Amino acid sequence: MTSSIKSSLLNLGLLIIFFVFFFLVINCRGESSTCLAVYKQGGAPAVFQSPKCPRWILQNWGSPTHSGAGRCHTAAIQGRRNYQEDRLLCALDLRIPFPGKTGTPKDVLVGIAAVFDGHNGAEASDMASKLLLDYFALHINFLLDATFSAMTRKLIGRFPTKGDHSVILHGVSRDEIMHLYNLDFQMQFRDSLPLHFDDSLPLDIMKEALLRAIHDIDVTFTKEASNRKLNSGSTATIALIADGQLMVASIGDSKALLCSEKFETLEEARATLVKLYRERRRNRGSSPSRFSDFKLEHGNGLLRFIAKELTKDHHPNREDEKIRVEAAGGYVTEWAGVPRVNGQLTVSRAIGDLTYRSYGVISAPEVMDWQPLVANDSFLVVSSDGIFEKLEVQEVCDLLWEVNNQTSSGAGVPSYCSISLADCLVNTAFEKGSMDNMAAVVVPLKSNLVTQLQRKEQSMNDNKDKIASALPCSNCTLPLPNDINLGPLQLKQAQPLGTMFNRLLRLKTEVFAAFICQRTLLGHLKGK
């Protein structure tokens, strides 16, 4: 083949590929320009209310009182209060599509566990628990939509050769993603997006989406509270689990903690057993920690759960919180032995609480950024503060150890612990005298990690098989949208969310399929 013919074929191939990608960019955008404009102006609240975004419809998510099914244990009880103001949420196995750095699709499994502790009414906690999933999904959708569009536009100007193994997404900047859809209406969150597409992209986008969701929940409730003259507020502690990693965003004094296995030496074990024995005597035998249930490993030491608190309480007497409150003109004083903003509000950060906003009470969450889960991390607990009126953080993990390692007869373990691990926590705290509402979510992590790894591997294999079968590269034809179906989003307890990503999955499939097609064509032409 002469060089002129080869050059002509190459130019023809490039021209064909250009039109393929032009078609994708024009016809495969996940959101209409009018809906994108609505999103730019008002975020999630505006999108769900606008007739310009007809496919976005709010679901009426309920807050379950208890569940021990599957890998998500939840429980909420009114306790000794006149009203139940606590709400909770647990949703596992959410499949979200992300672009991989090598050009292959990557579906990430996501779990959400959250507790909202309301005060001065349940309006704020109720709204937050119902809106979180919808708002989180919407923001992920728009951020991913911008990401895929930035990717396709970048691809139009860059066609790698057969030997080019650098990623097709290299060099797509944060600003390209944000400004493509003008997603900079919340400038304080822009820096959380990565400069390049790599393995951290899904985690960065999920963090960004969660922060935006929390912001928009507060915006929505602020408007509602202003219209209805509501005085209620709520804490919010939300944990995300994805790709074997964990992050937590927290407002107020609800807690998140990890219970992780730890081996103690004989000397350390001796001190632990003495402490547990004294605790049991002090509580007249009602302590959840029964030292006989801790395992001695080959006589060399003790295996037990160690608690790691993932959140910091936003109490007004915390030095940095107090400085902010006083700088805004508020003051911190104690009443009934509890520090309060202006002598009343017991938290310095909250969703709602409009009357305290001018005194330094804010709704911005404090974030524990993504950290890897390890093999000895056994349980994630997210709970309202009512449980910790009578249980220390370590006692919670001691109780979970006892229940998790009980004998087959279940001797010594209360009957309510057989319902769920969350029921075990809230009822133990109630029996020990807690006066508050109580809500808890307990996620067994070991089974969750194994499942995520298995599904991640299966997803990668499925994606490779489906793309390969859909692209007969001898003809190098672009598959129709229905030729590749990566399946609906899977979310335990929240199946209706699956429809939200259908168009996004289709766009993802077309973009990556087209890339494989053009890469094969170019390599074939240049190899001749």
Swiss-Prot record:
Residue numbers binding Mn(2+) 1: D117, G118
Pfam family of the protein (one): PP2C
Entries under InterPro entries matching the protein: PP2C, PPM-type-like_dom_sf, PPM-type_phosphatase-like_dom
GO molecular function: metal ion binding; protein serine/threonine phosphatase activity
Gene3D superfamilies the UniProt entry points to: PPM-type phosphatase domain
Family label: Belongs to the PP2C family.
UniProt protein name: Probable protein phosphatase 2C 51
Originating organism: Arabidopsis thaliana (Mouse-ear cress)
